[in-house]
């Protein structure tokens, strides 16, 4: 092989995207489609809500406990919840050209970590203290809490950025989300884990994201 051919081959390999680059290019293309992202958000909200009531009319059981008897549905719960939030947070950032700021970079990292944690959570079955598996129990609850914390942090990063620009409507959203998270922690400390308490911040997050992405008052003003 001639030197010119080697250089040409090296140039072609350099231009070929890595698996990581190909994945992010795919996500970037998907988040160009407003209707696609909206459909996922609505589907995620519906599936999350229906799943929470399976054998659980009083919402006493958490998603993890339901997953013990319905493991396949638990995986689908992760798919619908994880993908709908991941796509729509990326859509939110792109819609508002929220890319280069430090908070945007922080939010993007949190979104990826939240996506990873929700799938890690469903692959570590929930156990109780009496089962004698403390490490598994700790790993399951750690990934469950981190999934919620990372996705919440990604939304808060955007709302905080807008609030720093003195946008009243975004400040209201930020305060609403913050109070919801505080309320959840207080209720968990008082009543212990519960499907109803677990669902409240997810429902609020879905509603906030829908308003930010798809309602007229929150659409960015075009120059």
Task: Name each region found by the language model.
Residues 159-223:
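Terminal transmembrane helical module of multi-pass membrane proteins
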Residues 113-173:
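Membrane-proximal helix-loop-helix units in multi-pass membrane proteins
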Residues 103-118, 171-182:
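Transmembrane alpha-helical segments of multi-pass membrane proteins
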Residues 2-98:
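N-terminal topogenic module of multi-pass integral membrane proteins
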Residues 75-88, 146-158, 204-217:
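Hydrophobic cores of alpha-helical transmembrane segments in multi-pass inner/ER membrane proteins
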Residues 54, 94, 123-132, 185-194:
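Juxtamembrane "helix-exit" motif on the non-cytosolic side of transmembrane helices
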Residues 27-30, 93-106, 160-171, 221-223:
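Membrane-interface helix-boundary motifs at transmembrane edges
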Residues 66-76, 103-108, 131-148:
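Transmembrane alpha-helix entry/boundary detector in multi-pass membrane proteins
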């Amino acid at each position: 092989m001639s030197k010119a051919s080697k250089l040409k081959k090296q140039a072609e390999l350099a231009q070929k995207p890595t698996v990581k680059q190909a994945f992010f290019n795919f996500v970037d293309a998907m988040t160009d489609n407003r209707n696609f992202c909206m459909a996922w958000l609505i589907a995620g909200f519906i599936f999350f809500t229906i799943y929470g009531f399976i054998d659980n009319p009083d919402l006493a059981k958490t998603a993890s406990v339901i997953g013990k008897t319905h493991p396949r549905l638990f995986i689908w719960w992760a798919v619908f919840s994880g993908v709908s939030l991941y796509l729509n947070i990326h859509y939110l950032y792109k819609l508002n050209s929220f890319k280069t700021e430090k908070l945007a970079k922080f939010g993007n990292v949190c979104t990826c970590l939240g996506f990873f944690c929700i799938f890690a959570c469903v692959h570590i079955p929930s156990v109780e203290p009496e089962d004698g598996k403390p490490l598994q129990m700790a790993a399951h609850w750690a990934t469950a809490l981190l999934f919620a914390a990372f996705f919440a942090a990604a939304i808060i990063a955007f709302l905080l950025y807008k609030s720093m620009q003195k946008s009243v409507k975004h400040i209201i959203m930020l305060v609403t989300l913050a109070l919801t998270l505080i309320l959840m922690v207080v209720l968990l400390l008082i009543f212990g884990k519960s499907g109803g308490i677990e669902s409240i911040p997810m429902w609020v997050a879905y509603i906030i994201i829908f308003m930010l992405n798809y309602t007229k008052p929150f659409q960015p003003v075009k120059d």
